[in-house]
C-alpha cells in the first residue's frame, strides 16, 4: 500500500486514524501510508476497526491472566518544581501477578475532584488488603485467576469525562514530587492470542524481523503495568526506532510529544535546564530521567502535542519525536519497537548513550543487507549477476575475438582471463579488479604514439586452447619497426602481489641466455617471438616485456611468465608521454641514473618457479637504458642465493674475472663451466672498458680485499656504498639547510637539529671522528651451498 492515508481527525496536534479492516490488515503497508504525518507530529493514534477487536480473546482467559508477571517494578523518586523534574528509578526486588498488582493499585488512587457533587460519588474507595504480600505463585492457583476474569479491569467511566481528565492532569503536575509512584515497566511477555497475525504487537512484520537475535523491548515485546502517576520521561526510542504501544485493559495514558521540527529547540532547552547531565552525556535524554511540563515548554516557544490514550487503542511513536507521559491509574499495556525502510538512513546516524550498560545498538548496515536479501519485494540494489554489462565494465569478460581486435594497454586483463573460462571474476572480492581500478587512476599509459604500436599475433585465435595451456608456440610476426623498446607491466601479477617489490631487477628479453629458458623454441623466420599463456598458477604474469630489436643469428627460447616481474612499477621511454612511477620504500632516495639501475639488475640473482614446472626467465635489450652486455643468471632449478658482490667499477679484465668467480660459486656445479665460459666471452668483448659507477674513482679505496668508501666533502669513511649514499643525502643535500654544529649532519627543520643534539648518545664532531673497523665480506659454505654473509656498518 503506497497510497497516502489521511487522519480522521487531529486531537491536540496528534493525528488520529480510524482505518477500515482492509486498510488495517497490512501493518507494514499501513504504517508506510501514514508515515508522513507521524514524522511531523512525533506520535499518532490508531483506533483499530471492530473486526479486529472481535478476534481478540476477550475477556482474557484464566491461563492468559496467570502468565502475567510484573517483575522488579520501579519506584519513582521525583524531585523538582515549577514544571521541571528529575526522576530516579529504584527497582523493587519483588514479583507480582496481575491479581496482586490490582490489589496494590488501591494504594495509588487518583484524587476526587473537589468541585464534583457529593452525590455523584459511588462510595468510599476500598483499601488494599494483604493479598499483595502473598507469594505470587504458591499462593494462587488457576481457580483464583478464573474468578479474577470478571474483575481484572476497572470502571473506566470516569476517564471518559474530559473535564475529569483535565483535572487529573493538572493535579499530576502540581503534586508530582509529593509521592513515589510505582511502575511495572519493561517486563518481557505478551498476552495477544498466538493465532492473531494482524497487528499482533508480539509479531509485527517489519525490518527488525531480520535481526539475528531477539532483543527484549526492541524486537521482542514488553508488558507495562501502570498505576496512578507512573511516568515515562522525555526520551527518544533506542537507535531512533519507531515504537507501538497498545493498552490491553485499564486506565488511559496521557501522552505528550514534540513535533520533529522543534526537536533541536527542545533539546537545547533541556540542555540549559540540566547542564551537568548534558555535559557528561550528549544523549542524556535517553536516560529517561527528565520531565518538563507542557505548559513550561509552550512558555519557551516549544510546541507540545498532547492526547489521551485509551484502552484498546494503539499509539505509534516516530524517529526524532521526543515523547513523555504518565498513567491515570491501574492498567496493562504492551509495547515493542519496529522499523520501516525509511528508518534505515536514520538508524545509521542515530546517537547512542554509553552511560547505560544495556543501551541498544543495532548494526544497521548488516540489518539492511539481511532485509534486502530476504525481501523479494525490496527495491534495493539488484544482484551482481543481474547488472547490465555497461554498468560494470570490469565484470565483462570479452571473447577471444574481442581481445584480438582490442588495443593492448597496461591495464588490459591477461590472456588467462580469456582462455581460462572456469574462473569467474567478482566485482566485490577480486583483488585484480580493485587494483586495476586504483592503478588506472594513477597512471594512464597509452599506445597512440606511432613508435609504440605493435602488430598482433595473427595466428593467436587459430591456436587451440590446449596448445596455450601446454605452452606450445607458433610463428608470428610481433614487431617490425626498429625502434627503442617498450616496457609494459601486467597489472594481473601486481594484483596477485607478485610485483609488490618493484625494486627487483628485470632480466632482459631476446637474450642468448640459454639458462633463462626451460624449452628451446623452434627456428623462426625474421627472428620473431610468440609468448603463449603458461598453465601455471594465476600469479604468473602473462604479459611479457617485448623488444623490437632484431638480433640475427641468435636462437631464442619461448620465455615463460615469471612469478615475480622484476621491474620498477611503470617505466616508458621514447614516448611523448613519458611515465616513470616507482612505488618503493626506497622512493625517498636521491635520483640515480637509469644506466646504474639497469646494471644493478644484472648483479642480482633470482629464481622463478611454478608448482609443476620451472618458470623461465626472459630478457630484453634495454635500449637507451643501458648498452651493457648480458650477464648470465643461474639456472632457475637451483635455489636462489643473493650475492653481496656489487660491480662498482671494472678497472680491468682481472677484476671482472674475480667477480665472475664469486658468481660461479653461487651457481650449481652443473652450471659452473657454462656460466664461467660465458662470462669469459663477455670479458673479451668488453676488454678493459670501465663500467660507469655511482661513485667517483676517488670515493673508493681498495684496502687489501676490502673497499672503503670516502665522502669527498668531509672525508668521512664508510664500509659500504649504501651508507655513503645515505650520508651524502643526509649531510650534504641542499634540501636540508640546517646542520648540526658538532657533526655537520643536515636537517630540514631547526627543531630536528635540537632533537639531534639532545639524544642520549651525543654526536661526534668532525675533528674527533675515529675510523671504526670495517667488517669484511666472507664466503662461508653452508650445507654444501655457497652463502655470502656481509656485515657493514658506517664508520661515523
Curated annotation (Swiss-Prot):
RAD53-dependent phosphorylated in response to DNA damage. Residues 601-621, 654-669 have a biased composition (Polar residues). Residues 14-55 form the JmjN domain. It comes from the Eukaryota. GO terms for biological process: chromatin remodeling; negative regulation of autophagy; negative regulation of transcription by RNA polymerase II; positive regulation of transcription elongation by RNA polymerase II; regulation of gene expression. It is found in: Nucleus. SUPFAM superfamilies: beta-beta-alpha zinc fingers (SSF57667), Clavaminate synthase-like (SSF51197). Transcriptional repressor of photolyase PHR1. Recognizes and binds the sequence AG(4) in the upstream repressing sequence of PHR1. Derepresses PHR1 transcription when phosphorylated. The modification Phosphothreonine is found at residue 399. A motif (Bipartite nuclear localization signal) lies at residues 455-471. One of its GO terms (cellular component) is chromatin. This is DNA damage-responsive transcriptional repressor RPH1. Keywords: DNA-binding, Metal-binding, Nucleus, Phosphoprotein, Repeat, Repressor, Transcription, Transcription regulation, Zinc, Zinc-finger.
Amino acid at each position: 500500500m503506497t497510497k497516502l492515508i489521511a487522519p480522521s481527525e487531529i486531537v491536540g496536534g496528534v493525528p488520529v486514524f480510524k482505518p477500515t479492516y482492509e486498510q488495517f490488515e497490512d501493518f507494514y503497508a499501513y504504517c508506510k501510508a501514514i508515515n508522513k504525518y507521524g514524522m511531523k507530529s512525533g506520535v499518532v493514534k490508531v483506533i483499530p476497526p471492530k473486526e479486529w477487536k472481535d478476534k481478540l480473546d476477550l475477556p482474557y482467559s484464566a491461563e492468559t491472566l496467570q502468565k502475567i508477571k510484573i517483575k522488579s517494578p520501579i519506584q519513582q523518586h521525583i524531585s523538582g518544581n515549577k514544571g521541571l523534574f528529575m526522576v530516579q528509578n529504584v527497582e523493587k526486588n519483588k514479583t507480582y501477578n496481575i491479581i496482586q498488582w490490582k490489589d496494590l493499585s488501591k494504594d495509588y488512587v487518583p484524587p476526587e475532584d473537589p468541585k464534583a457533587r457529593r452525590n455523584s460519588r459511588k462510595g468510599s474507595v476500598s483499601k488494599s488488603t494483604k493479598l499483595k504480600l502473598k507469594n505470587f505463585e504458591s499462593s494462587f492457583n488457576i481457580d483464583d485467576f478464573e474468578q479474577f476474569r470478571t474483575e481484572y479491569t476497572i470502571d473506566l467511566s470516569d476517564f471518559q469525562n474530559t473535564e475529569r481528565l483535565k483535572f487529573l492532569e493538572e493535579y499530576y503536575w502540581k503534586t508530582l514530587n509529593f509521592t513515589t509512584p510505582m511502575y511495572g515497566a519493561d517486563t518481557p511477555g505478551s498476552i495477544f492470542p498466538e493465532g492473531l497475525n494482524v497487528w499482533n504487537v508480539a509479531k509485527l512484520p517489519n525490518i527488525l524481523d531480520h535481526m539475528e537475535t531477539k532483543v527484549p523491548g526492541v524486537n521482542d515485546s514488553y508488558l507495562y503495568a501502570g498505576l496512578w502517576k507512573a511516568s515515562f520521561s522525555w526520551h527518544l526510542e533506542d537507535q531512533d526506532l519507531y515504537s507501538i504501544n497498545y493498552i490491553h485493559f485499564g486506565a488511559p495514558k496521557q501522552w505528550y510529544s514534540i513535533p520533529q521540527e522543534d526537536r533541536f529547540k527542545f533539546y537545547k532547552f533541556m540542555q540549559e535546564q540540566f547542564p551537568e547531565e548534558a555535559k557528561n552525556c550528549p544523549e542524556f535524554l535517553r536516560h529517561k530521567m527528565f520531565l518538563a511540563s507542557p505548559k513550561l515548554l509552550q512558555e519557551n516557544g516549544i510546541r507540545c502535542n498532547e492526547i489521551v490514550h485509551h484502552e484498546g487503542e494503539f499509539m505509534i511513536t516516530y524517529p526524532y519525536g521526543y515523547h513523555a507521559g504518565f498513567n491515570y491509574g491501574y492498567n496493562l499495556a504492551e509495547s515493542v519497537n519496529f522499523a520501516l525502510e525509511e528508518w534505515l538512513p536514520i538508524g545509521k546516524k542515530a546517537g547512542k548513550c554509553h552511560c547505560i550498560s544495556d543501551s541498544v545498538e543495532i548494526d544497521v548496515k548488516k540489518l539492511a543487507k539481511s532485509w534486502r536479501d530476504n525481501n523479494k519485494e525490496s527495491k534495493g540494489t539488484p544482484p551482481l549477476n543481474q547488472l547490465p554489462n555497461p554498468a560494470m565494465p570490469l565484470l565483462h569478460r570479452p571473447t577471444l575475438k574481442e581481445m584480438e581486435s582490442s588495443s593492448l594497454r597496461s591495464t588490459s586483463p591477461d590472456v588467462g582471463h580469456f582462455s581460462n573460462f572456469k574462473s569467474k571474476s567478482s566485482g566485490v572480492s577480486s583483488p585484480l579488479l580493485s587494483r586495476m581500478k586504483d592503478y588506472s587512476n594513477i597512471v594512464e599509459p597509452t599506445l597512440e604514439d606511432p613508435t609504440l604500436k605493435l602488430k598482433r599475433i595473427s595466428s593467436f585465435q587459430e591456436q587451440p586452447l590446449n596448445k596455450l595451456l601446454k605452452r606450445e608456440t607458433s610463428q608470428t610476426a610481433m614487431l617490425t619497426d626498429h625502434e627503442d623498446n617498450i616496457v609494459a607491466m601486467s597489472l594481473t601479477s601486481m594484483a596477485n602481489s607478485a610485483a609488490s617489490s618493484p625494486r627487483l631487477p628485470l632480466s632482459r628479453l631476446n637474450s642468448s641466455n640459454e639458462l633463462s629458458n626451460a624449452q628451446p623454441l623452434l627456428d623462426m623466420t625474421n627472428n620473431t617471438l610468440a609468448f603463449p599463456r603458461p598453465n601455471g598458477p594465476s600469479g604468473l604474469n602473462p604479459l611479457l616485456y617485448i623488444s623490437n630489436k632484431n638480433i640475427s643469428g641468435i636462437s631464442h627460447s619461448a620465455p615463460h611468465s615469471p612469478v615475480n616481474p622484476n621491474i620498477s612499477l611503470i617505466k616508458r621511454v621514447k614516448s611523448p608521454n613519458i611515465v616513470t612511477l616507482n612505488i618503493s620504500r626506497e622512493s625517498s632516495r636521491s635520483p640515480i641514473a637509469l644506466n646504474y639501475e639497469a646494471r644493478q639488475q644484472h648483479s642480482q640473482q633470482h629464481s622463478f618457479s611454478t608448482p609443476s614446472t620451472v618458470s623461465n626467465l626472459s630478457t630484453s635489450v634495454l635500449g637507451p637504458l643501458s648498452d651493457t652486455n648480458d650477464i648470465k643468471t643461474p639456472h632457475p632449478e637451483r635455489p636462489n642465493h643473493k650475492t653481496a658482490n656489487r660491480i662498482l667499477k671494472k678497472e680491468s679484465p682481472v677484476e671482472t674475472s674475480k667477480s665472475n668467480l664469486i658468481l660461479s660459486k653461487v651457481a650449481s656445479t652443473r652450471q659452473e663451466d657454462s656460466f664461467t665460459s660465458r662470462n669469459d666471452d663477455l670479458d673479451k668483448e668488453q676488454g678493459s672498458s670501465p663500467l660507469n659507477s655511482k661513485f667517483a674513482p676517488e670515493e673508493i679505496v681498495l684496502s687489501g680485499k676490502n673497499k672503503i668508501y670516502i665522502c669527498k666533502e668531509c672525508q668521512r669513511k664508510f664500509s659500504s656504498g649504501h651508507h655513503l649514499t645515505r650520508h651524502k643525502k643526509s649531510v650534504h643535500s641542499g634540501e636540508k639547510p640546517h646542520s648540526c654544529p658538532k657533526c655537520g649532519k643536515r636537517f630540514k627543520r631547526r627543531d630536528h637539529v635540537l632533537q639531534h643534539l639532545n639524544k642520549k648518545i651525543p654526536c661526534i664532531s668532525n675533528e674527533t671522528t675515529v675510523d671504526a673497523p670495517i667488517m669484511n665480506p666472507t664466503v662461508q659454505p653452508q650445507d654444501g651451498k655457497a652463502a655470502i654473509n656481509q656485515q657493514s656498518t658506517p664508520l661515523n
